[in-house]
Amino acid sequence: MELPSHKTKIIATIGPASKQKETIKKMIKAGMSVARINFSHGTLEEHAKTIETVRDVAEKLERRVAILGDLPGLKMRVGKIKGDSVTLRKGDKVVLTTRDIEGDETTIPVEFKDLPKLVSKGDTIYLSDGYIMLRVEEVRENEVECVVVNGGILFSHKGINIPKANLPIEAITPRDFEIIEFAIEHGVDAIGLSFVGSVYDVLKVKSFLEKKSADLFVIAKIERPDAVRNFDEILNAADGIMIARGDLGVEMPIEKLPIMQKQLIKKTNLAAKPVITATQMLVSMTTERIPKRAEVTDVANAILDGTDAVMLSEETAIGKYPVESVEMMAKIAKTTEEYRESLGYSRLRAWIDSLPKRSTIKEAITRSVIDALCAIDIKYILTPTRTGLTPRLISRFKPKQWILAFSSSERVCNNLAFSYGVYPFCMDENFNEKDIIMLVKGLGIVKEDDTVLLTEGRPIGKTVGTNTMRIFQIP
């Protein structure tokens, strides 16, 4: 078998433009590692069919594709629009109404009854991740009359942002918990928690999953100033982080976003947890076959910052070129990774070495792995794992070698789909080193006399963490 051309993981949102079996097949072949289901749109019946299609296609292609379910959260959204979209032009008057109607260019329904209580004359309201800007002219009992300051095309169920508004609702809603139950039932691998404000939002979901005896990977989406302020505690509780730049760039000064992204990626790397950079990465490809030069640079810089994964949203959900968007992301990743060595794990190693010396044996071993990679021409890193931690500890250094991870847990293997440079293999229970070598040789990944590095826990057969590193040539 042939490993992917790039190590950065690509998450693609499945929607009306990409839910067809043939399109999903092409996206997987192009490099999609994770299929994202956005539960803010569509019905659960539609999502169940999409999940089934992704699983079926991935199995036939013999590819491992994880499924991420993105929860709606507390986000205010516009309602249903006639024809699914409307063009709002600068200077137009438009009314936001809490009435349950179908919207048009003059009246837009909102799915939040308390909207009139949150705004006053002169306030700014943003729609569709800040692309459209409205100024409040008059507030009535169930309506807000506005003038369009920045126009654009508004689609059904797009988000509403009111900077500095205090939303009187929980971050994780009752509807979210219903969707989590659906996700458990349908074998979704990970859930994205929208509009997390504090560690308690993460812990509440973790507690719910524990009661359901479910071990879904919990990814906290950072899209509110509160989440940035409480980031360290959120990072400690979550399994992974998504930097959701659309809402974050509206809720805080946009000029602070680039540095904030770098800081959050660095912290998540240090914690050895996967970090996803999301929103508007190749957004021009929603309608154009070739992305903007600035978008290509944005993707490359996120990869150089240390992101594990990059995410496509409307580009693949509703765009004209879903397959081409994945292909472009893969091309950018491949080219950028070739230049990482001068900026990559040496910098992260310096950061880690500057931390207080509280390393575990496993962490010390993974640091030694990086030293060995710098000294010897090693082809692959082989990491048997029960929890996925050892591959992630190595992955944070972003080495140029593939990390081949082996686990008897299907869930662990799917969760590793979010980590940079990790290619997971699901093994039978009680597999050993001989089984690993037979597998990778049989697949044609390694050849006789290739030098590989193996991490393992000794004594073999005992439930112990990684405590040993060996370098040897494939017999």
From Swiss-Prot:
Binding annotation for substrate: R36, G246, D247, T279
Pathway: Carbohydrate degradation; glycolysis; pyruvate from D-glyceraldehyde 3-phosphate: step 5/5
GO molecular function, one term: potassium ion binding
Gene3D superfamilies the UniProt entry points to: Phosphoenolpyruvate-binding domains, PK beta-barrel domain-like, Pyruvate kinase, C-terminal domain
Protein EC: 2.7.1.40
Chain residues that bind Mg(2+): E223, D247
Annotated residues for binding of ATP: N38, F39, S40, H41, R77, K158
Matching InterPro entries: Pyr_Knase, Pyrv/PenolPyrv_kinase-like_dom, Pyrv_kinase-like_dom_sf, Pyrv_Knase-like_insert_dom_sf, Pyrv_Knase_AS, Pyrv_Knase_brl, Pyrv_Knase_C, Pyrv_Knase_C_sf
Enzymatic reactions: pyruvate + ATP = phosphoenolpyruvate + ADP + H(+)
UniProt cross-references to PROSITE patterns, sorted A to Z: PYRUVATE_KINASE
Keyword rRNA-binding found: no
Cofactors: a divalent metal cation
PANTHER family in alphabetical order: PYRUVATE KINASE
The protein's assembly and partners: Homotetramer.
Family: Belongs to the pyruvate kinase family.
Name assigned to this protein: Pyruvate kinase
